[in-house]
Amino acid sequence: MKKSKFLLVLLAFTADFLVQSPARVFAGPVEDVQAAMQLVKSKAATLGAPIVNGDEAVAGKIVPAIHFGATKMNNNFVLVDEVQKEVGGTATIFVKSGDEFVRVATNVKKDDGSRAIGTILDPKGKAIAAIAKGESYYGEADILGKPYVTGYEPVRDASGNVIGVYYVGYLKN
């Protein structure tokens, strides 16, 4: 009887795990990143077109306020947390501020456990080189001293100008 009870519990646990995180079980790192990117972009698109309207303080820095439709993303973590809840990993919305891209909505954590808002996209990294050309970057990146498998895609306004960056990533094993 004990053996069958154990097997039932194991089966229930396995079924629950598969239902809650199928992408992480069956997909590899590249597929995970691509699926997460599609999710963050589709969630943003349901809010509306990306625009920059006004400025706002993010972690003490005054930066442009990026919106999807009427929803301001600066200091708003709903979208990135929903993505993390659904597919794991990390997600960020960056806004272009001068020559930098600043994290305004993120679930990437600093060493002290706080959200890494106000930090910038590595100015010497491969991702920013691609984004500066209006291109996407998929590959490894160092994020706040830790290796991640990542995806970065430009956020464009209605005129096609790059106004920000979508980011998703998974800590490299």
Where do the protein language model's features map onto the residues?
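Extracytoplasmic/periplasmic sensor domains and loops in membrane signaling proteins
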Residues: N74-G88, A105-G145
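C-terminal segment of classical bacterial N-terminal signal peptides
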Residues: D16-R24
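Conserved beta-strands of PAS-like sensory domains
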Residues: H67-T71, P147-N173
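Bacterial N-terminal signal peptides
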Residues: V9-F17
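Extracellular/periplasmic ligand-binding regions of membrane signal-transduction receptors
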Residues: P29-M73, V108-R115
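Short N-terminal helix-loop-first-beta-strand/juxtamembrane motif that initiates sensory/input modules
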Residues: A35-N53, V80-F101, Y138-E140
